Amino acid sequence: MLRNRITSRRSISSSVSALANYGKPQNPAIDTTVKMRIQPIKREGETMEIKRARLIYQSRKRGILESDLLLSRFAKKYLNEFTEAELDEYDRLLDEPDWDIYYWATKNYDVTPLPDKWKDSKILKMLQEDAKNDDREILRMPELDLEQK
């Protein structure tokens, strides 16, 4: 009889505990995400021609098709007209994560808020205008103009 009473208390105790924790994860997940930002390479002594070529390459080879399309078309359209200061600003923009650039270009700020440092950016405003695609062109990667200087 005493043995049954002890067993009953144990089963009731474990049942109450199980009910209290019902639906809760038994082993809560531990966030093991490591967040780190790699600083961009500082390039010194780079000529305007080499910088333009590098920026064209970096605009075309982002790793995300959406960003590749937006940035490669933008680079084809404007890069040859940019001043050195505008090239530097575009270079800094390309140092940002791909999805951030895409969401900023498409003004999707609820997904990725626009940082203060980019709020007055002439280059980002130009990219946003280009991303609107008012002419409703089918977006394709522009051909490389290897003769371009």
UniProtKB/Swiss-Prot annotation:
Keywords for this protein: Chaperone, Mitochondrion
Compartments where found: Mitochondrion matrix
SUPFAM superfamilies from the UniProt entry: YgfY-like (SSF109910)
GO biological process: mitochondrial electron transport, succinate to ubiquinone; mitochondrial respiratory chain complex II assembly; protein-FAD linkage; tricarboxylic acid cycle
Cellular component aspect of the GO annotation: mitochondrial matrix
Principal place of residence: mitochondrion
Family membership noted in the UniProt record: Belongs to the SDHAF2 family.
Note: This protein may be expected to contain an N-terminal transit peptide but none has been predicted.
Function: Plays an essential role in the assembly of succinate dehydrogenase (SDH), an enzyme complex (also referred to as respiratory complex II) that is a component of both the tricarboxylic acid (TCA) cycle and the mitochondrial electron transport chain, and which couples the oxidation of succinate to fumarate with the reduction of ubiquinone (coenzyme Q) to ubiquinol. Required for flavinylation (covalent attachment of FAD) of the flavoprotein subunit of the SDH catalytic dimer.
Subunit structure: Interacts with the flavoprotein subunit within the SDH catalytic dimer.
Official protein name in the record: Succinate dehydrogenase assembly factor 2, mitochondrial
Organism: Scheffersomyces stipitis (strain ATCC 58785 / CBS 6054 / NBRC 10063 / NRRL Y-11545)
